[in-house]
Curated annotation (Swiss-Prot):
Subcellular location: Plastid, Chloroplast thylakoid membrane
GO cellular component: chloroplast thylakoid membrane
Annotated GO MF terms: NADH dehydrogenase (ubiquinone) activity; ubiquinone binding
PANTHER family, per the entry: NAD(P)H-QUINONE OXIDOREDUCTASE CHAIN 4, CHLOROPLASTIC (PTHR43507:SF21), NADH-UBIQUINONE OXIDOREDUCTASE CHAIN 4 (PTHR43507)
Keywords, ordered alphabetically: Chloroplast, Membrane, NAD, NADP, Plastid, Plastoquinone, Quinone, Thylakoid, Translocase, Transmembrane, Transmembrane helix
Family: Belongs to the complex I subunit 4 family.
Gene: ndhD
Species of origin: Arabidopsis thaliana
EC number: 7.1.1.-
Name of the protein in question: NAD(P)H-quinone oxidoreductase chain 4, chloroplastic
Length: 500
């Protein structure tokens, strides 16, 4: 066990520091904003320092582990630890949350509570990624939902209450299946509950019971990922939420579902995952085509980007269901890659809305001359989303392709068919992204607002855009940095399977 409680401090610090903000003056909007940014930067630096000096890349076992008895009556432990699977998502969470707080500068109504909720969400997300106890994972999973619901219901568009209610119904409803799975898997085979993930990974179950557990966890994670047909909350939520909240949703929240699929379904229930993986492969392939073909029909800019997220998550599902070293590594790389790209696109959509106050693409047009910096960044990041070589999306999708090709689980004819359908999805992606750029920035100037003058991207927006663009290009040029973090853990997970 680690001598110093690094992870406990990293998890508790944001929400504790955020609670102090509630005692700051009511009219101190700037104070609240800068205080929150300082907390996020300090948290990110603390996380980076702890990982740089304590994390060993060649060790697939749990590191920085902490194990404290929390509630004696329930025999409940506070177990924390990280490995190659969680370190990338934790660093991504810190980076995106810091930029999202900077993006939230225009928020003035109840800004103190808004920023507190962002910090509470930060703690819940890091807690989920670093939990080594199944019940603690569930508690952190639920803790993170409360601030998200409040952020969605209090700040956003006219239909924000509808979208927030839809979000909480989907996520809270699926959490019932998660809780049943947690209780079932921990109580099976012993009088005392076993909630330690390391012990549960070595446990075996009857086939029927393992399938039931797998389905319960799958429903919970499929809603968050999202996997079709449980995705319908996502476009509505993104369409109404404030763009800083959208950055957190696209950059981190969706990745929690994919993380859960690998951490619990794939690692704890390998036999059931082996049985369900062909179905997941089919669903992931359909998801790419469905979302890519639905996206061009969306008038709302943020809904179009939301459907692109659904399409890109399909590659993660395919990588996970390939049960190969390249496939799973590609899925993890896509989790990180899309975290940056999705957050960047929603930020740029939000900054565009701040200037023109329009969300419908058919009402826009000819903005390239008026806002050239935003146009340039939007174009570059759209290219990243359609997997342009040299960007992180390209290498992630290429590795997933390679994972399917090398998979020993599937017949050659089925692999050829899956790759063919995936290729069609990749062809459809430029269609909806390039048509989005054309409707926004090219053609005649359709915006007809009296006494309205555009102002281009300021230093804050430019700094944010470049900050997200740099890791996208960096990962695209040198993906080994991200792949090396998880490679040993991936091998450890796949050792439970008989092919790979």
């Amino acid at each position: 066990m680690n001598d110093f409680p690094w992870l406990t401090i990293i998890v508790v610090f944001p929400i504790s520091a955020g609670s102090l903000m509630l005692f700051l003056p009511h009219r101190g909007n700037k104070v609240n904003k800068w205080y929150t940014i300082c907390i996020c930067i300090l948290e990110l630096l603390l996380t980076t320092y702890a990982f740089c000096y304590n994390f060993k890349m060649d060790d697939p076992l749990i590191q920085l582990s902490e194990d404290y008895k929390w509630i004696d009556f329930f025999d409940f432990y506070w177990r924390m630890g990280i490995d190659g699977l969680s370190i990338g998502t934790i660093l991504l969470t810190g980076f995106i949350t810091t930029l999202a707080t900077l993006a939230a500068f225009p928020v003035t109504r109840d800004s103190r509570f808004f920023h507190f909720l962002m910090l509470a969400m930060y703690s819940g997300q890091i807690g989920s990624f670093s939990s080594r106890d199944l019940l603690l994972f569930f508690i952190m999973w639920e803790l993170e939902l409360i601030p998200v619901y409040l952020l969605l219901s209090m700040w956003g568009g006219k239909k924000r209450l509808y979208s927030a209610t839809k979000f909480i119904l989907y996520t809270a409803g699926s959490s019932i299946f998660l809780l049943i799975g947690v209780l079932g898997i921990s109580l099976y085979g012993s009088n005392e509950p076993t909630l330690n993930l390391e012990l549960l990974a070595n446990k075996s179950y009857p086939v029927t019971l393992e399938i039931l557990f797998y389905i319960g966890f799958l429903i919970a994670f499929a809603v968050k990922s999202p996997i079709i047909p449980l995705h319908t909350w996502l476009p509505d939520t993104h369409g109404e939420a404030h763009y800083s909240t959208c950055m957190l949703l696209a950059g981190i929240l969706l990745k929690m579902g994919a993380y859960g699929l690998v951490r619990i379904n794939m690692e704890l229930l390998p036999h059931a995952h082996s049985m369900f993986s062909p179905w997941l492969l089919v669903v992931g392939t359909i998801q790419i085509i469905y979302a890519a073909s639905t996206s061009p029909g969306q008038r709302n800019l943020k809904k179009r980007i939301a459907y692109s997220s659904v399409s890109h998550m399909g590659f993660i599902i395919i990588g996970i269901s390939s049960i190969t070293d390249p496939g799973l590594n590609g899925a993890i790389l896509q989790i990180i890659s899309h975290g940056f790209i999705g957050a960047a696109l929603f930020f740029l959509a939000g900054t565009s809305y701040d200037r023109i106050r329009l969300v419908y693409l058919d009402e826009m047009g000819g903005m390239a001359i008026s806002i050239p910096k935003i146009f340039t960044m939007f174009t570059i990041l759209s290219m990243a989303s359609l997997a342009l070589p040299g960007m992180s999306g390209f290498i992630a999708e290429f590795i997933v392709f390679f994972g399917i090709i090398t998979s020993q689980k599937y017949f050659l004819i089925s692999k050829i068919f899956i790759i063919f359908v995936m290729a069609i999805g990749m062809i459809l992606t430029p269609i909806y992204l390039l048509s989005m750029l054309r409707q926004m920035f090219y053609g005649y100037k359709l915006i007809n607002i009296k006494n309205f003058s555009f102002f281009d991207s300021g230093p804050r927006e430019l700094f944010l855009s470049i900050s997200i663009l740099l890791p996208i290009i960096g990962i695209g040029i040198y993906p080994d940095f991200v792949l090396s973090l998880a490679s040993d853990k991936v091998e450890s997970i796949l050792s439970n399977y008989f092919y790979g």
